[in-house]
């Protein structure tokens, strides 16, 4: 990758990623699945290249099982506020999140 007088292309990619974080609409909600078990579902991150890493970090930080499937992150248990707080700490705009 070449550099110009405005900075490296890597810094441009970082800027674009930050702009993407600002325009994403994230919805965090509780759902009931098999056998009456609660799960936390996160939508709106499917366009992100690092959605697998985000899923792994959420599972590790919250201490629960989960998966990324069909454009949704699904975590075992009701962790809506914890997910919101972790995403805000990761740099996502709190105003772009809807917690139901």
What are these regions (language model features)?
Residues 1-56, 60-61, 67-69, 81, ...:
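Long, charged, low-complexity intrinsically disordered regions
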Residues 72-76:
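A generic structural motif
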